[in-house]
Curated annotation (Swiss-Prot):
It comes from Aromatoleum aromaticum (strain DSM 19018 / LMG 30748 / EbN1). GO terms for molecular function: histidinol-phosphate transaminase activity; pyridoxal phosphate binding. This is Histidinol-phosphate aminotransferase. Belongs to the class-II pyridoxal-phosphate-dependent aminotransferase family. Histidinol-phosphate aminotransferase subfamily. Its cofactor is pyridoxal 5'-phosphate. Pfam families: Aminotran_1_2. Homodimer.
Length: 356
């Protein structure tokens, strides 16, 4: 710690991202990256943009990208906000829409960046326990008596559990909380869920956030977006323009547009991930693992007779990395990214050997 740090920095507990080790022949199944490459059209667009034009600032509004997203999801460009990955979009949403006198509510087991944002921006919050099956209970997010939330946020599918909430339950939560903004974090929705974006037209308090990092294979490019009522988008723009007027560079805009427009590549690769996930879930179950139903590009699993931390360590010794969370209620679970068929087969074979 430094004497020059502000009081806010002294009190922060920063988010810890999944590690990115540089090891040869590594089977990397710890950070939910797409096992297949980006759209060839996106790569071509990025290469074409890598020209003398890089001496010029990018479009501060990223209008081409907003238009592509709007067309893809059947909304208006003025209902779209874009940012440097969905983490930045979420950060702006916390500051612009979720900081109020009443506390923000989100699940106790969820994306661990949420409490970090609250600490950074001084947002009061309360966590709501998942049920015994690690599902979000919609009734827990409805006002009870005079107690109403200052905001609500949760991923759908949830992370790290992979559990999916039906769209009907999401709409019930949004409709039941007209006093606040409800943010649905849909980083993994393309792997088995139904997006809440169509509900935006009917609910001015709903903001839906997505990313191109997962289903569009562009984690290294950092492109995220939100869809919501123009009033919510204006609030996000105000925060963005008070922080960084040029969050997306020329390469990100060009690659993002092409990735959004390449529907064939998107559908083919996401369906491949879904098929592999189902095989992996069945293979893990055959080894005695308890596997939660997943609508994401990962599985959340535990073995009833083996310590999760020790399993992760033994896999690592075999050059296979998975994610282990040292957190109450889930310390005996592993989150395993769905890789290629070959990577998942190597994982299953390693676990079979460990369990002998």
């Amino acid at each position: 710690m430094s004497q020059y740090w502000s009081a806010v920095v002294h009190g922060l507990t920063p988010y810890v991202p999944g590690e990115q080790p540089k090891l040869a022949n590594l089977v990397k199944l710890n950070t939910n990256e797409h096992p297949y490459g980006p759209s060839p059209r996106a790569l071509a667009a990025i290469r074409a943009e890598a020209s003398d034009a890089l001496r010029l600032y990018p479009d501060p509004h990223a209008d081409r990208l907003k238009a592509a997203i709007a067309t893809r999801f059947g909304v208006e460009p003025r209902e779209v906000f874009v940012g440097n990955g969905s983490d930045e979009v979420l950060a702006h949403a916390f500051m612009a829409l979720l900081k109020h006198e009443r506390p923000l509510r989100f699940p106790d087991i969820s994306y661990s960046f949420y409490p970090v944002y609250c600490g950074l921006y001084g947002i009061a919050f309360e966590t709501v326990p998942l049920d015994d099956d690690f599902a979000i209970r919609p009734d827990d997010y409805l006002p009870h008596g005079s107690v109403a939330a200052g905001g609500i946020i949760f991923p759908n599918p949830n992370a790290p559990t992979g559990r999916l909430m039906p769209l009907s339950d999401i709409e019930r939560i949004v409709a039941g909380n007209p006093q606040c903004v409800v943010v649905i974090d849909e980083a993994y929705v393309d792997f088995g869920g139904e997006s809440a974006i169509p509900l935006v037209r009917h609910h001015p308090n709903l903001l839906v956030v997505q990313t191109l990092s997962k289903s569009r294979s562009l984690a290294g490019l950092r492109v995220g977006f939100a869809v919501g009522n123009p009033d919510l988008i204006e609030a996000l723009d105000r925060v963005k323009d008070s922080f960084n007027s040029y969050p997306l560079d020329r390469l990100a805009i060009a690659g993002g547009v092409a990735a959004i427009e390449d529907e064939e590549h998107f559908q083919r690769t996401r369906m491949a991930v879904i098929a592999t996930r189902e095989r992996l879930s069945a293979d893990l179950a055959s080894l005695g693992f308890d596997v939660l139903p997943s609508a994401a590009n990962f599985v959340f699993t535990r073995h009833p007779h083996r310590d999760a931390g020790e399993l992760a360590a033994q896999l690592r010794r075999r050059a296979i990395i998975v994610r282990h969370f040292r957190q109450p209620r889930i310390e005996q679970f592993l989150r395993i990214t769905v890789g290629t068929d070959e990577q998942c087969a190597a994982l299953v074979e390693a676990l079979r050997d460990i369990l002998r």
